Amino acid sequence: TQDRYSLCFALGKALEDQHEYVESFECYRRGNALKRSELRYDPAKSRQQMLDMASICTRSFFAQRSAWGCPKPDPIFIVGMPRSGSTLLEQILASHSRVDGTLELPDIPRLANLYRARQGTSRPGYPANLPLLERAQLRELGEMYLEETRIHRRGAPFFIDKLPNNFREIGFIHMILPNARIIDARRGAMACCFGNFKHLFAAGQEFSYDLREVGEFYGLYRDLMDHWDHVLPGKVLHIQYESVVADLESNVRRILE
């Protein structure tokens, strides 16, 4: 099955390059259907997880924990949907002498999972356990993140952590690293969703193999980003991919500022 859907995606790209769009779409459709049949992705679970995060991470929740966590401003998180221009933003930032580019770092999800494991099965799971984190724990988690990511740095005062799915973890990031910068790489719904549908990911992104499901996930992403803007006003810088392509110079200035 893997060989079949890999071939479908490759043929879809080759036909698209030849402007054979009907045939190309049919190859993508078949490849996605084969890949989706192997997965256990549950759209309802994704929706509930994001609703749970939003219900816990309120303005008052963050106000009660103001200036908790590790105060260092070193990380610049690039988040958003896959295929939304995050790599371009990373390249722009990494061209600055004060910023180190890195990899797609798994440390934020891993730390969240580590905390969940510490609590054991008798306690609520993540994110319901976020209110249980005490001030000293948040600082420890922030310092742990900086220590574990140090291996990827080359001496610049700032570094990039580009893991698009971290848009779901902005609340956790703010709790442990309140002075970290966060950039949302955003792209129009049609281009972003179809870009996901055409791409065979090496791992993860299980929402992307069905057009309805990727559209629903994009809506969840936008809703959660709107929530972060409401409860953490000014925390996230939103950069539209189409705007960067149309006017690179002014957007580069905006990003670097």
Residue ranges, per PLM feature:
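PAPS-dependent sulfotransferase catalytic domain
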Residues: T102, P106-E134, R150-E257
